[in-house]
A protein has these predicted regions:
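Hydrophobic anchor residue at the start of the ABC signature
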Residues: 157
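Conserved ABC ATPase signature
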Residues: 143-147, 151-153
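ABC nucleotide-binding domain "signature" region
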Residues: 122-134, 250
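The feature captures the beta-strand-to-loop junction immediately N-terminal to the Walker
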Residues: 64-66
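Helix-to-loop junction immediately C-terminal to a conserved catalytic motif
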Residues: 79
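A short, proline-enriched helix->beta-strand linker immediately N-terminal to the Walker B motif
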Residues: 162-166
Length: 299
């Protein structure tokens, strides 16, 4: 079960019989992810430092933090894309990733992109079913270069969903979208999560986005989870709804931008991106590794 330095991340199915029950979280609920004592270093500096984390099955968790704090590195470890680690990491075998850049192969039509990395020779109908779920089936035969930004991101989501994941990992998937398309994409992800019932971990700088989507919000600082709060707000949610403003203020404080939203009229999204830009873009966490399709990544 443990993953020693230079050894692979273990999946639930690799650590026991195929019909074994998933591990229990600290509160007794089934856990989709369990991490204990995880450390990942770059050039002698621990980007993730003895981190512990449990994600419950079916829970939508959002991870916030400054650039370079280790959040994208953590996501890559959970995806199986970064294995130079020490510690214990248990994740479902069926997992998938969607990144900010859709990473579609320009020489393959959309439906073929959706099927990339799947074992065997799945038929076009399999891709079209996933594309229909994200409202893009009519573009199945299109070339990626003809897609809008929002369409390309939906194709990326279809590529993740076709794997029937128990864990969906999202690394700022809405960051490059315009405001209206971003809202629509957020709504789509919320609908897909409620329909699929898988665990979701979303990395973002947008505090409002976190509160609109999450069951639980984590703030990462100095390679560890520094703040962990449930989001006990009724769904569907709106910015400014009861309890929303207080939670936003608390999260902005944890992110080191206390008073930014209230004093200047700056939105929580803008505040989050502003604090992110103050950090070095040269950190290991800010430079995602190229994904490997055999570890559950949809690229």
């Amino acid at each position: 079960m443990a993953t020693d330095l230079h050894r692979p991340v273990k999946t639930l199915l690799e650590t026991g019989p195929a019909d074994a029950s998933p591990p229990a979280s600290h509160n007794g609920a089934d856990a989709a992810v369990r991490v204990e004592g995880l450390t990942r270093s770059f050039d002698g500096r621990a980007v993730i430092d003895d981190l512990d984390l449990t994600l419950k099955a079916g829970e939508f968790t959002v991870l916030l933090g400054r650039s370079g704090c280790g959040k994208s590195t953590l996501l890559r470890v959970l995806a199986g894309l970064d294995r130079e680690i020490s510690g214990t990491v248990l994740v479902p075998r069926r997992r998938a990733v969607a990144f900010q850049a859709p990473r579609l192969m320009p020489w393959k039509r959309v439906w073929r992109n959706v099927l990339l990395g799947l074992p065997g020779k799945p038929e076009r109908a399999v891709a079209e079913q996933a594309l229909a779920e994200v409202g893009l089936v009519e573009r199945a035969g299109a070339w990626p270069k003809t897609l809008s930004g929002g369409e390309a991101q939906r194709a990326s989501l279809a590529r993740a969903l076709v794997r029937e994941p128990d864990l969906l990992l999202l690394d700022e998937p809405f960051g490059a979208l315009d405001a209206l398309t971003r809202i629509k994409a957020q709504q789509l992800v919320a609908e897909l999560w409620q329909r699929r019932g898988c665990a979701v971990l979303l990395v973002t700088h947008d505090v409002d986005e976190a509160l609109l989507l999450a069951d639980r919000v984590l703030v990462m600082r100095d390679g560890r989870i520094a703040y962990d709060t449930p989001v006990a707000l009724d769904r569907p949610r709106e910015v400014g709804s009861p309890g929303f403003t207080d939670l936003r203020s608390r999260l902005l404080t944890e992110l080191g931008v206390e008073g930014a939203g209230r004093a200047t009229g700056l939105s929580a999204q803008s505040a989050g991106h502003a604090q992110a830009r103050t950090e070095s873009a040269e950190s290991p966490d800010a430079s995602p590794a190229r994904p490997h399709p055999h570890h559950g990544d949809p690229s």
